[in-house]
């Protein structure tokens, strides 16, 4: 199963919005085939693993290990459970149940109904952790939310004066671009958009630009900001539309008499968006924290001190908090569990 997890990670950029899955075929204690889900819409891990077996006659006496329950429904590809049944494999070992509503145990039931021995829950926590973004999207019906900010040595996120405060180094800024490439959407508030004028693209990292979201209730942001340069699509969360056309901009008009974040996350879920990166500032970040609508946080601790300014967000007590280094910078990575 650990080999399944290794293989699954190879699909990090290609598999989403599908989960990352790895599969291994074992005969008489030897691996005779393996595969992973390479890209969304392509063959699943079990198919690639079965197809890699040179002597198909061995399958009837083989065990197939797979990190996620084989699918049981027709989507872009046929059900993997049907394939395993047709190949008459002897046994299937599953890492974890698929939380997707169209599966959720049905794949395992189909295998057992065909007389195949099935074992479930091997390295279950590791398998769920690997696909935590997919699991959150399916089980909580919202995107997996990652918070990211940099704070000074004395706990400030920005100086008192308007304008950008440079806490990150050019190297640690690459971590921001890495996180952007790993997420479907990036969000900032009106003040950050106006003061920092960020482009919110992945220009210093390989990967697609995320959808940019800006919270601008009164539609007051000027049209010459980098967010409206058309380099990447932008979703403006407002009460009304801007007076002029802005390239690549669409709108979401929530009911401001109701909680905003819940409405926004529900809308992103409806659009099939699985991951959201929140880059601030403090007011926006704190609103996610106070609402409990976050899953992971990357907090860079800079070496400089700021003489007063905007305090960094306050984190609650979390069950998982770990110091890490990225690109020579010191970070705290926290999980909301």
Cite the ranges covered by each PLM segment:
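Zn2+-dependent cytidine deaminase-like catalytic core
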Residues: 25, 30-126, 211
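Proteins enriched for Cys/Gly/acidic motifs involved in redox and nucleic-acid/cofactor modification
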Residues: 14-15, 41-42, 108, 122-150, ...
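Enzymes that bind and transform nitrogen-containing heteroaromatic metabolites
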Residues: 1-19, 34, 54, 144-337
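N-terminal pre-triad scaffold of radical SAM enzymes
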Residues: 62-72, 140-151
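N-terminal glycine-rich anion-binding loops that anchor highly charged ligand groups
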Residues: 15-29
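Short, well-ordered, mixed-charge alpha-helical segments that flank or form enzyme active sites
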Residues: 73-75, 100-103, 126-130, 153-158, ...
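Short low-complexity, flexible loop/linker segments enriched in glycine and/or proline
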Residues: 107-109, 133-136, 202-204, 293
């Amino acid at each position: 199963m650990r080999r399944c997890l290794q293989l699954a990670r190879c699909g990090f950029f290609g598999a989403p919005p599908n989960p990352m899955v790895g599969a291994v075929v074992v005969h008489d204690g030897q691996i005779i085939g393996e595969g992973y889900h390479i890209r969304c819409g392509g063959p699943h891990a079990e198919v690639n693993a079965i197809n890699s077996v040179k002597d198909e006659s061995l399958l009837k006496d083989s065990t197939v290990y797979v990190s996620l329950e084989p699918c049981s429904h027709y989507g872009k590809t046929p059900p993997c459970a049907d394939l395993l049944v047709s190949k008459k494999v002897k046994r299937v070992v599953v890492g974890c149940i698929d939380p997707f509503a169209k599966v959720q145990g049905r794949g395992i039931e189909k295998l057992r109904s065909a007389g195949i021995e099935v074992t479930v829950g091997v390295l279950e926590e590791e398998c769920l952790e690997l696909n935590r973004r997919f699991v959150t999207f399916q089980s909580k019906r919202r995107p997996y939310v990652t918070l990211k900010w940099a704070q000074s040595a004395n706990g400030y996120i920005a100086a008192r004066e308007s304008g950008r405060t440079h806490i990150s180094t050019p190297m640690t800024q690459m971590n921001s671009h890495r996180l952007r490439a790993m997420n479907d959407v990036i969000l900032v508030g009106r003040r950050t958009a106006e003061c920092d004028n960020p482009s919110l693209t992945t220009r210093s990292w390989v990967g697609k630009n995320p959808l940019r979201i800006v919270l601008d209730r009164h539609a007051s942001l000027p049209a010459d900001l980098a967010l409206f340069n058309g380099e990447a699509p932008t979703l403006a969360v407002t009460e009304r539309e801007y007076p002029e056309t802005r390239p690549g901009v669409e709108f979401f008009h929530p009911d401001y008499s109701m909680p905003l974040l819940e409405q926004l996350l529900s809308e992103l879920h409806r659009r099939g968006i699985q991951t959201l990166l929140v880059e601030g500032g403090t007011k926006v970040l704190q609103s996610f924290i106070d609402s409990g609508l976050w899953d992971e946080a990357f907090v860079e601790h800079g070496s400089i001190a700021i003489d007063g300014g905007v305090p960094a967000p306050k984190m609650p007590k979390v069950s998982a908090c770990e110091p890490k280094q990225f690109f020579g910078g010191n970070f705290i990575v926290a999980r909301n569990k």
